[in-house]
């Protein structure tokens, strides 16, 4: 711990080493867990209620993909969390395995994946709905707020949450899109594995 020097951190992230808030940390947990309701709320739509199996499979695949990417990256990078640099934080909080899991933010990536998935599926099933702008506004705001709270809580640097947001949003948007049937009937599917993600192109 004594060898850690904030001066070695890039200018964008450096100021985050002074952040540490249990309240912000707990609030980010609430947003993460609350985002799990977003895919479930899709069932309120009549069109989607008639096709729950497909939506459930797509959401499960989205969760597996974002989980795999996030976990593999954390273990590969092992970036030290901002609070570890903070001298006011107790030493015992800085020595756990979680202290080196900063890059990238799992809370942000999972939240973005959930909300963007819900918005993407809603837009597909209700392409002419007047609620689409509202749905997309909520979908983009919740993970942004989650990322802010993770930085405020000292758990992540700004670049951690920006990356997490991008990965989660891309996953939540792309997985349903890849499964959409085109006019040709051809489909492209993501197949998550333990240590990789594959693509299957099916021609009908």
Task: Describe each region flagged by the PLM.
Residues 40-43, 147:
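Solvent-exposed, amphipathic alpha-helical segments
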Residues 1-39, 76-92, 98:
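N-terminal transmembrane-helix/juxtamembrane module of multi-pass inner/ER membrane proteins
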Residues 21, 25-35, 50-51, 59-67, ...:
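Soluble non-cytosolic domains of exported or imported proteins
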Residues 43-48, 119-123:
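Structural signal for the C-terminal ends of transmembrane alpha-helices
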């Amino acid at each position: 711990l004594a060898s850690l020097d904030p001066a070695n951190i890039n200018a964008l992230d450096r100021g985050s080493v002074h952040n540490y808030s249990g309240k912000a940390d707990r609030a980010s947990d609430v947003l993460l867990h609350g985002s799990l309701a977003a895919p479930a709320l899709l069932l309120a739509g009549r069109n989607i209620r008639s096709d729950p199996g497909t939506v459930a499979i797509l959401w499960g695949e989205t969760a597996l993909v974002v989980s795999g990417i996030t976990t593999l990256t954390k273990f590969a990078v092992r970036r030290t969390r901002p609070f570890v640099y903070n001298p006011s934080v107790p030493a015992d909080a800085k020595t756990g395995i979680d202290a080196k899991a900063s890059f990238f933010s799992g809370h942000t990536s999972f939240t973005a994946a959930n909300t963007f998935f819900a918005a993407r599926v809603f837009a597909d099933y209700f392409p002419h709905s007047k609620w689409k702008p509202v749905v997309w506004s909520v979908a983009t705001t919740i993970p942004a707020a989650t990322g802010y709270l993770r930085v405020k809580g000292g758990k992540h640097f700004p670049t951690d949450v920006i990356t997490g947001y991008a990965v989660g949003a891309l996953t939540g948007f792309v997985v349903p899109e890849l499964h959409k049937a085109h006019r040709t009937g051809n489909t492209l599917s993501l197949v998550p594995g333990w240590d990789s993600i594959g693509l299957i192109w099916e021609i009908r």
